Regions:
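N-terminal hydrophobic/helix-forming segments and targeting peptides
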Residues: 1-437
Length: 437
């Protein structure tokens, strides 16, 4: 990867990540370009000191790591997620209708529903194809508009602008053109197979707009899927800048799936991907249980997921004492109910690394009367007991079909994560860090 961070590289990743499967494939391609070797989970792994590897699970989650060059003493690790709120196609075969080609969908995650209306949409995901030897996955994404979700005109709904409660089953079903059209046939052509060879599929709707700079000076940008592909790409970039100068430290980067629906899947943060890979790496190194616990204690894991910037039209929705400014730096996310993993201990360490790197940090906290959401860190903590810090970048219109964020913040995140992967971290005793700043 280019040693200079480029916002265009982030845009390419956002444009490529039209589904969790495509996000994972895009990350895998970047890793392979940088010398990382694929290790299928079902294969026996032959891992070498200092080696660079990655594995995928379900084709929608991916984990990469650099092996330590000497006896294991600790880890660097950053986690993000590959999925975004969207609409899942229930089945490929269009429903019978005399006028339109229809394929029913259901909501995935907590999207802003009306943001999907009246815009050109495509589909993306994977089809499972029957072959002579079994079943094969193939990514599909027609590079054109194939669907839309039409609004009910104002003449039939005079109260539309006074607030409407959308019923996903009734108001938000897409059309795929005129009656007689076949979504299965379109995807079969994309996959290079016959329609009858598609056994099953995982398909979602996706926006057609490309990532684009916004603002009189181009300081912001708009795109679909900023949450959380912005953090995924910037942490991956930072991970790839790690020089591996500490012989006993291993470096990890992971992008989970299904965060938007609770992470409770095999490929989600509540699954065992992270723990399984670490265990296999430690076993290859001959690490004892005690050595494993000590190494995981000498770790600061970054859970990276975006947060809400203070809205220009509704500043009252944010904590008045902690306004979040787009372009103001990385968010250090805190929550008294432990929805975020940041503590004074872990926040101090990350803040010190950012200060040394010249990266500004903003404290993110919800209003006391707003419960707020959660993210990867506290769920991943059910599997891996490492010190963690929740970070992110401020954005507007989270979970809309199109979101807005800051170009400067993306650069800040990339710079901070690169500094993190090149900073020795050691916990000599509980409540004390030694940082190689």
């Amino acid at each position: 990867m280019n040693h200079e961070f480029s916002i265009d590289g982030l845009f390419d990743f956002l444009n490529a990540g039209v589904s969790a499967f495509h996000s994972t494939a895009a990350a895998a391609a970047i890793l392979e370009e940088n010398g990382y070797q694929n290790c299928p989970e079902s294969a026996a792994w032959q891992l070498a000191p200092g080696g660079k590897y990655y594995t995928t699970r379900n084709g929608s989650a991916i984990m990469a790591w650099r092996m330590p060059k000497g006896p294991l003493t600790g880890w660097h690790a950053a986690a993000s997620h590959s999925d975004s709120p969207t609409w899942r196609v229930k089945k490929l075969d269009c429903a019978e209708d005399k006028v339109f080609a229809k394929a029913e969908t259901e909501g995935y995650g907590g999207m802003i529903m009306p943001s999907w209306l009246d815009r050109p949409l495509s589909v993306a995901g994977r089809v499972l194809v029957e072959t002579e030897s079994g079943i094969e996955s193939r990514l599909v994404h027609p590079d054109r508009a194939v669907a839309c979700i039409p609004n009910l005109c104002i003449h039939f709904n005079r109260d539309l602008n006074n607030g409407m409660k959308y019923n996903p089953q009734v108001d938000l079903q897409p059309i795929f053109g005129a009656a007689g059209g076949s979504l299965r046939a379109v995807l079969a052509r994309e996959a290079g197979v016959k329609p009858e060879e598609i056994v099953d599929a995982d398909i979602v709707l996706c926006t057609r707009e490309k990532a684009e700079r916004l603002g009189l000076n181009g300081e912001y940008f708009m795109s679909g899927r900023i949450d959380d592909l912005e953090c995924a790409y910037t942490t991956l970039w930072g991970f790839l800048q790690g020089r591996g100068e500490e012989e006993g430290r291993g470096d990890v980067w992971v992008m989970f799936d299904n965060e938007e629906v609770g992470s409770s899947s095999r490929q989600g943060a509540c699954g065992t991907l992270f723990a399984d890979v670490l265990s296999r790496v430690e076993e290859s190194l001959g690490v004892t249980k005690e050595q494993s616990i000590r190494a995981r204690t000498n770790t600061l894991l970054l859970s990276a997921d975006n947060g809400h910037a203070t809205h220009p039209n509704h500043p009252e929705k944010s904590d008045p004492a902690n306004p979040i400014v787009m372009g103001g730096g990385i968010l250090l996310k805190t929550n008294a109910s432990q929805k975020y993993t940041t503590s004074g201990f872990t926040g101090a360490a990350f803040s010190a690394i950012c200060k040394k790197a010249g990266v500004p940090v903003q404290t993110f906290a919800n209003r006391a009367d707003v419960p707020g959401g959660s993210t990867l860190g506290n769920l991943l903590g059910h599997q891996i007991l490492m010190p963690m810090v929740d970070i992110g970048l401020g954005q507007l219109a989270m979970h809309s079909a199109m979101e807005t964020a800051s170009c400067a913040d993306a650069e800040y995140m990339a710079k901070a994560v690169a500094a993190y992967y090149n900073t020795p971290i050691f916990q000599p005793k509980d409540g004390e860090w030694k940082l190689g700043l």
